[in-house]
Design a protein with these regions (language model features):
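Active-site-adjacent beta-strand/loop module that shapes the phosphate/pyrophosphate-binding cleft
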Residues: 86-109, 142, 146
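Short Pro/Gly-enriched beta-strand edge/turn motifs at strand-loop
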Residues: 2-8, 82-84
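Conserved Nudix-box catalytic region and its N-terminal flanking loop in Nudix hydrolases
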Residues: 30-74
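Residue-level preference for beta-strand/loop junctions
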Residues: 14-16, 45, 93-97
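A short coil-to-beta-strand element that immediately follows conserved catalytic motifs
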Residues: 74-83
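Short loop segments at secondary-structure junctions
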Residues: 26-29, 41, 104-109, 123-125
Length: 147
């Protein structure tokens, strides 16, 4: 094999786009207020867990923190990994793989970037039927997890 052939082939291979999402638990004076969901301003429209794409040269953790600041204006502390979601049909636009974290924050979310609105939902009031992508499955995993 010629030098550099493997690297050239790797550049030609189409791979899933890497994304990250964070289920943000909002706290006020050590009291749980709920989790943040955004109302998307771009298709597919509906409610979503805040998240976005990992940039080249960026770790998924760094991307998660950056996206939370950009999308909902919150400084988030990541507390754990919920899971990795990679069903090729999870995003109707293209194949993505998402690393989903749980994080804690204080304050009020402010819609920005891809968010038309950002709101705090009590766990029992999450409208699961309005969640886009595979976020219903992700939310059910979160709700069924201890903690």
């Amino acid at each position: 094999m010629e030098p550099g052939t493997r690297a050239k082939r790797a550049k030609m291979i189409e791979t899933p786009k890497l994304t990250t999402d964070v289920i943000i638990r909002v706290w006020e004076k050590n009291r749980f207020q709920g989790i943040v969901l955004i109302d998307r301003k771009n298709p597919p429209l509906g409610l979503a867990i805040p998240g976005g794409f990992v940039e080249v040269g960026e770790s998924v953790e760094t991307a998660a923190l950056r996206e939370m600041k950009e999308e909902v204006g919150l400084e988030v502390q990541l507390v754990g990994l919920l899971g990795i979601y990679s069903d090729p049909k999870r995003d109707p636009r293209f194949h993505t793989a998402s690393v989903v974290f749980v994080g804690d924050a204080t304050g009020e979310p402010q819609a920005a970037s891809d968010a038309q609105e950002a709101s705090i939902y009590l766990l029992e009031e999450i409208p699961l039927d309005r969640l886009v992508f595979d976020h219903r499955e992700i939310m059910l995993d979160f709700l069924g997890s201890p903690d």
